[in-house]
Amino acid sequence: MSTNEQLAWDFDDGDVAEVRPDTGIARFAPGSEQWIAALQPTDDDAIRLDRFDVNTMTAEAAARLWARVAAWVESDQIAYYIDDSPVSSDAAYDARMRCLERLEAAFPSLDNPQSPTHRVGGSFSNDFVSVRHPSRMMSLDDVFSIEELKDWYDSVIRDLDWPESKPLPMSCEVKIDGLALNLIYRNGVLEQGLTRGDGVTGEDITLNVRTIGSIPANLGGPKEDVPDFVEIRGEVFMRWDDFHTLNNEQEDAGRAPFANPRNAAAGSLRQKDPRITATRRLSFYAHGLGQLTWGADHPRGTHDVVADQSQAYDLYTRWGVPVSPHNRAVTSFQEILDMIEYYGEHRGDIEHALDGIVVKVDDLGLQRTLGATSRAPRWAIAYKYPPEEVNTELLNITVQVGRTGRVTPVAVLKPVYVAGSTVARTTLHNGFEVKRKGVLIGDTVVVRKAGDVIPELVGPVLERRKGREDQLREFVMPEFCPSCGAKLAPAKEGDKDIRCPNVESCPAQLTERVISLASRKAFDIEHLGEQSAIALTNPEENRPDSVATYAPNITEVLVAPGEEPDPYEPVEGLELPAAQKPVLSNESGLFDLTAADLRDVRVWREAAIVEVHETVGANGKKKKVRKRVGGSGLWHQVPAFWTAPTPAKKLTAKQLAERAQREAAIESAETQGGAASETTGAPTGAEAPLGTMPGFAAASYPEYDVPADAVIVRVDHKTTRTGVTDVPVIIRPGENTRKMFDEMDKARHADLWRVLVALSIRRLGPPTARLIASAMGSLAAIEKATIEDLTAIDGVGPEIAESVVNWFAATREPGDWRGATLRAWQAAGVGVDEAETSSLPQTLAGKTVVVTGSLEGYSRDSAKEAIIERGGKAAGSVSKKTDYVVIGANAGSKAIKAEELGIPMLGEIQFAQLLETGSID
């Protein structure tokens, strides 16, 4: 293409766009590597793509062009469908899409289900496919004391044979409490975003990564600074101010707040719908490099031009990739201690949560000399701050009842901020533990977070008791269940735990069982969470004790900053509504539920106190800022599963015409003896509604949008300039309710092991349920199994076998709730499918593997499941029969025993290799 050539296209509106000839790309032959690298996401280059004949390309060049254009199209789709702020013209977007389609037609290997050409409209979702990292993404070893840190520092000096008198450059940075992320850029274009996973493979969360504003879609800076390929490692996190804003929004919407910023970031980053992630205000800081390739034709050449961490940070800055401002270059151990001391005192003063200081050898050449273990580099270490301890008041000790009837004392604390989140409650495990700690209700107590995660009540501050003895009282475990009133007792002699024996109908136990059966470890009914479970089993939870705190029309109390709410005076004659009966009295009716059954279920919500003040926005205009500051103690009821009454939307003339057209198509199809095609679509309201109030028929209001599942509850008379108009007011199942029923339908065909877990059989978890389901093959066979049959299965112990046999024996007792549940579920199609055989290669057949310690890429259960799925036995103890022991962080006595017995010990990387190949050779 000559530099004088002009290209143009006609847009739909007749305008013409011309390519400016001074872009530099015209110097290169179309389709060449230089031409592909010079392409930019501009309208000009989109025209070039539209005119380019892809059939002249080699397969390798086509793959490079496809990757570049696909990334731009995906960014365009996210900007349009998710962010609602298009960045490209429709014509440019269409041209790029046509280019992809031509490439995929000419080179079929490029056509894959993840291609943007297969995405319809705004149907974005993440499948979280596992992808191999181009280079291993390691974790860091932790140390918890200055002595351990000094040992590491001395070992680095010793291994490098570094002269004592010569300063060793190191870099120190705060350890962000977030999620590790690997960003892959090819020719400066963001290609993929991967979670750490097990360090060898991670989950592809590219769609969600593209919604994070601080992560550039294209690397900036001069072309000579942009490599052919680079992996940028960093941390996704949520700033404190964004975290508090999100939690206010959660509470305003009646949803549970997140415990801490890390949980919020993790939950946001792993959303299947990236539109949700886009609203969560996530941030990113880069802190490391993976693979870096400049390419033979690159101005920098093929040599490694990044010599140390400081140069890497300089590159990030030029590329537009953010780095943490909280880092220092140091040359002595004392300077490292200074950094640790400073941020230990200022943990709450920076923009994000932190849980330690990372120390790295600065020089990349020295890093390579030091090398790495199977899971972590030897040239870096993470110093973890000791658990933060604070004092607060023990207001009360209550008890909670779990799904198996276990009654646990819970400390109710004066809310206190500790290690990244507010703590108001923490478990005390059992009555013996309360006595051992020696705490009294009313004590000032010490609270910390074990591992900076789990709140723990350490004990009382005895000095604070002086002069207050008459205000303190001892906790006594209750004699009767606080939920159902049944007499409490240990399950057997010698048990420390006491239990509620009313397994069938204790509301607290039933609620916990429903939460459990809907969890990911069982039926995986995502939209049947804690609040929905409470609404189904105990809708009167939080019912006010008297009318004095019943405020049916108050959903929030507005106050000025620093003001207290006015006293509440109930309306004269106000009475509490009649108590509701729960929809579920046990699990048997779960799969028989319909949306109509849930129409009148209402739950209690506390009105929030909202502080409102005026401020001036960036545009100079006044705006009101709202902040939730607490609960008011006033309660009202809200629909749990259906929407509140809402006026139906009036259809436009165009919408009415489209509906008439669809109805005509359906009528025509029915007349011809067929059914309307799926593409024609049934009109809104085509199905019979669940029911309407007497006298209110949807057909009477054809000009309004009344969905098929909606109910008209009343008709409002609206006065307009043309007279009085009747507006139907409707209710319908909420979006989450509709999703819940869809997920329940899928759960009818859940794997057999999931059904076993959902039955809440004591001691039976997913790994053992998988073993039993795989060996027995059907629910009918498991029902008939003896203890001997089950213990004959490798990995099933006598206690679990006894629990399973006893549970199914109870189902045969007349009137037993477990039998009713089992028969009702089977009638609904649950558990009637045969157990599925694992489709994974049986790489571990005949091998016994023990997992100990914490793994980055696996929970304890998921690691065991990975072993079992591949034919292996996931044992709980180390013996001479053990083939391998997988060692994670904080491994205990099992690692010592494995070493004594000479059993191969694997890191997480080797574990991944073992799963894949069955060998570590």
Curated annotation (Swiss-Prot):
Binding sites annotated in the UniProt record for NAD(+): D90, A91, A92, Y93, D94, S139, L140, E173, R196, E235, K360, K384
Where are the active-site residues found?
K175
Q: Which domain of life is it from?
A: Bacteria
| Positions with a binding annotation for Zn(2+) | C481, C484, C500, C506
Q: Where is this region: Disordered?
A: 663-688
A GO cellular component annotation in the UniProt record: cytosol
EC class: ligase
Cofactor(s) needed for function = Mg(2+); Mn(2+)
Q: What is this protein called?
A: DNA ligase
Species: Bifidobacterium longum subsp. infantis (strain ATCC 15697 / DSM 20088 / JCM 1222 / NCTC 11817 / S12)
